UniProtKB/Swiss-Prot annotation:
PROSITE patterns: ADH_SHORT. InterPro entries: ADH-rel, NAD(P)-bd_dom_sf, Sc_DH/Rdtase_CS, SDR_fam. The gene is Adhr. NAD(+) binds at residues 11-34. The keyword Oxidoreductase applies. This is Alcohol dehydrogenase-related 31 kDa protein. It comes from Drosophila ambigua (Fruit fly). Substrate binds at residue 139. The active site is at residue 152. GO terms for cellular component: cytoplasm.
Amino acid sequence: MYDLAGKHVCYVADCGGIALETSKVLMTKNIAKLAILQSVENQPAIAQLQSIKHSTQIFFWTFDVTMAREEMKKYFDEVMVQMDYIDVLINGATLCDERNIDATINTNLTGMMNTVATVLPYMDRKMGGSGGLIVNVTSVIGLDPSPVFCAYSASKFGVIGFTRSLADPLYYNQNGVAVMAVCCGPTKVFVDRELNAFLEYGQTFADRLRLAPCQSTAVCGQNIVNAIERSQNGQIWIADKGGLELVTLHWYWHMADQFISYMQSTDDEDQECFLSAAYRK
């Protein structure tokens, strides 16, 4: 059980929808500090959060997740002056715009990866940090494909791949930073707007989503926090239809586990065994 009490949490997302509801729940967990980095200032939302727990310090910065990593580093140097350290980094910035592939990929995947690469040194135990937890908030269509939102789905598949790769013991045993993901099902806020399919053949289905049964952002936010509290390194959760489900992960490449062992091994005999097994296949 991951105890959020006293933690310093940094949430990179727009303060609305899932992000706002998740932040509301976090404020009930007796966290010490909450940094909100978002593209647009939302003072009413910040005031609403502060009213939940007056003793929790809330900091706000306008933030463009698509900025270059060099600029991001300067940005987080300033953030760390106020935060001192980060226990939990939540990546929740998201965009579904099938007509703007670059923006969708840059927001959902590239920006998230740059954020993680920028923040990790502050958390890394071998670099003076205390370890911690990185939470990537993504989508169920990062687990299963979507014929309607192809670019969005591709970006979310990337989030899952990045999460699983970074959670490998190769990193975790060194830096002490656990990495997990929560795949959210569709919410009312997501479907209640104009949605464009990647190809015109899928537009009818995109339009029908407005009538589809969806979870509320409040329930989804609650389950994101539930997943954080129950988390272990490398876990992927589904938050959908009011419930929370742990994903059973699979290895599809038959040499995956041997390949990882090969990379980590310094024993020549072990390496020869891997190569022999690979060539037999």
